[in-house]
Swiss-Prot record:
Pfam families: SDH_C, Shikimate_dh_N. This is Shikimate dehydrogenase (NADP(+)). Gene3D superfamilies: Leucine Dehydrogenase, chain A, domain 1, NAD(P)-binding Rossmann-like Domain. Keywords: Amino-acid biosynthesis, Aromatic amino acid biosynthesis, NADP, Oxidoreductase.
Amino acid sequence: MKIDGYTRMAAVVANPIKHSLSPFIHNLAFDLTDENGVYLAWEVESKKLAAIVENVRNLDMYGLNISMPYKGEIIKFMDELSPAAELIGAVNTVVNHSGKIIGHNTDGIGFFNSLKKYDFKIENKQMLVLGGGGAAIALIAQAALSGAKKIVVAARKSASYDPLNEKLAKLSAKTGVEIFLTDLSGADRLQKELNQTDLLVNATSVGMDGASFPLEKSLLLPDRLLVVDAIYKVRETPFLRWAKEQGAQTENGLGMLIGQAAESFYLWTGKEMPVDKITLEMEREV
């Protein structure tokens, strides 16, 4: 890596963040594309966010990636939001557009871009998502923006269930796409929806331990189904093994991780990230 007077910076901002794989991904991408840039990890307190964003402008940085817990809080410091970021209510990518600071969310578009190798497009298709956290909302919003026919969200009954239902109703009203919530423990209803589903996604952390399972194992999967687990630190979760045993195409969360990074990289540099080469390196790293 060459560092000189022309080198531009990007960084990921969160707390904690020193464990992040983002510097590995982006610095490798800078090298492979001959882009004179460097990517760092900044672990900062909430009170420093305004100054960090101002540094993007003052230091002519490419921009930032934003991770938890700041994806929502960073919004108030943006000059403008992309349609996806506005709909999701979270920013994971900050772009310096000639001094104008624009907040984007690349989680959803990165996820669906990672499925192109299966010739899969969400337009006019049905998706079933397990979980209703931040990752799930990003995928749901992007699916709606991309013309999904129907989106079913399955979550366990808890204190967050009714607020999630309200959030999904608002997303549905804003996009005109049918989005509804169902109880994850309702096996009969889930089976009915699965029979019509084209894409099944686990957007929970269940399975991160390599043993736990997010839904009833008695459920039967349709032949044409594509099944994705957002978890990437476990190469093949029990959920993916179960789906593969039923004949489904399966994908772990590494594609989503690299896909969202690739979209950020493009927004900053105008260059395509060499995803295939970086995926090979990441498979050795993870």
